[in-house]
Amino acid sequence: MTEQDLEIIQGTIAAIVYQNYDNGYAVLRVDVGAKQVVTVVGTIPLPAVGERLLVTGKWSTHASYGRQFEAEFLERLMPQTAMDILNYLSSRIIKGIGPKSAARIVEHFGDQTLIVIEREPERLAEVSGISPNRARIIGEEFRQRVGVRQLMEFFALHQLPAELAIRTYKLYGESTTDLLYDDPYLLMDPGLDAPFGAVDRFAIELGVSADDPRRVRAGILFELNYNLSAGHSFLPEDKLTVATAQLLSVETETVKEAIEHLLSARQLIRNTLAGITVDYLPALYEAEEYITQRLLQSAATTFPEPKHLNRLMKSAAKQSGLEYSQQQEQAIRAGATAGVLLVTGGPGTGKTTILKGLLSLLGEMQLKCVLAAPTGRAAKRLTEVTGEDASTIHRLLEASIEPASGEMVFLRDENNPLKADVVIVDEMSMVDVLLLHSLLKAIPMGKRLILVGDPDQLPPVGPGFPFGDMIRSEALPTVRLTEIFRQAQQSLIVMNAHRVNNGELPDLKNVKSDFFFLPCRSEEELRQTITGLCTTRLPQKMNIPADQIQILSPTRKGGAGTESLNQLLQSTLNPAGGGKRERQFGDYVFREGDRVMQIRNNYDIVWKKCDGSAVGTGMFNGDIGIIRSIDPHMETMTVVFEDREADYDFTQLNELEPAYAMTVHKSQGSEYRAVILSCWNGSPYLLSRSVLYTAITRARELLIIVGRAETVAAMTENAKRGRRYTGLKLRLQGKV
């Protein structure tokens, strides 16, 4: 198509039919005058009702939606008259301004309103009902919206995600475009989570050469940061060199020169482990070094055995109403004197009994204990089984956002340590090396640390595998629980978990217990079986309501994966209609009443207790909630997380995903009354023994595996764990 074939239309946005915050695509109804409203489609980031557009494009006819104007270029025309400005502001385009306040503002400033908001926002306080602080916030919101929108349009020209523009603007502010022209690879800041391929293409479009040192250095840092997500704390230097050279299509010598530059700038740390030269990001190197030092110091610290320990043990046992086995008594006694203690064991081996016993004994010793776990669900479960308050590690450390940088920081550290004599952490297999580093810094020297977990479950999502490394190092006091108690032996869930962990096939034929297998011949049969279990069989025949059932799958993709199952289960358990409001985001439609999950830590989301008793900040990866309401005018969605509720701006919906079904990895640290495991074909990396073992141990009363017996067998046989490059074990053993 030539420029002569393009047309130009001008009009006012009358309605927003659809908008995708991820890529900026929108479908608009635009009033072009003469009582004519047309449909305009294209990349139009953050449109607002009442906004005027000058659009260049072409007409087309959609098979389902009819005639529409496809936008290729657009110019936003700020409203000029007082009436147009009133309509524009009344659309709630700026948070803090509704129809009533818009009328008062426009009445006061007339056609100069937008100039005042942009250049002299403090003058808004001249309007009744607007405080100086609110005036400042309105000005910031307006400038940010204009800046983000301009950046989105700039990014759209270079095929960069619109959502990335929002995060980038928050980080770099009004100077973003100038900064990116100077160095496009600023987009590779880890906090932006930008795809390297898209950023690299963008940089080349701006004139960066293939062997530009900025590009090569960015490629090296990308490789290291990318491998953090695979669990690695470092990479061997030869592997890092080759991987970067292949990524960028440059010579290895060019990469080696860039590595030396990064080393001299302290952006990399070189180390030797087992005779191999390796490269760390500084934060990972410092974390391993500090953890090693603190744990070995704690291991060398033993506290005197309290007087009358036997009497205290009996008193603790009586208080908790429990009788200890020999292994359990050994663990509890060790907890009375050890500076650091590891307690490990599978399901049914009595870890909960030990936790209760330790708390009773340490209480008898007049020691203050704090309990923590990696996720909110794990912390809630810890509270339930011990009867004591427990929090997430992030909340224990008082995670907060540093205003100047926008980065997450912990307010509890070596300068503001925890006020506790003993810190007890459960579900340690989920804790990565960076989080453990932060935790140890907040524990004063001379205090006690008790770490409880099961290293045979899946390793942490983040870098390292500190709990597994600690146990395998044999350098720290450790109690291994191996005895399965008689009551636990009655549970096929427990016994099959141990069978799988030992490489034996689970019993799939027993139909009179808490563990069932339902074979399926096709993915469609699997999907229908799961639907029937959730809607009819479990609620009606076993009195287990749908909200107490969790679907798990090793995979995200495919008909048996979580993405497809979530769409199926939403349509079944929470269908459209009945006045329920919705919001499309990406490929998913969020609907009032949906079960959703927070998928990344966000330390500045404000929440409040549902009873209004408290307000706080921070929602964390793995938190599960229900969408209570969707407000299209305020562009917010309210989600209730058990006893708390939080409002999400529509631009934050990338932090949520449906949770009718979730991956086994996401379920770690949780326990559900009933678990249905979708077991079909998939990657050997995902269909592993540790994935199956972790899935089985998520069920409290009932586990149903739906799918192929061959897949269950393959998972049981696949004992391979993805290798993680981590130096903690060697450091603890003194082999560095």
Segments (PLM) and residue ranges:
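Structural detector for short beta-strands of small beta-barrel domains
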Residues: 5-20, 57, 624-628
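ASCE P-loop NTPase helicase motor core
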Residues: 329-332, 337-511
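Conserved helicase motor core of P-loop NTPases
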Residues: 351, 455-617
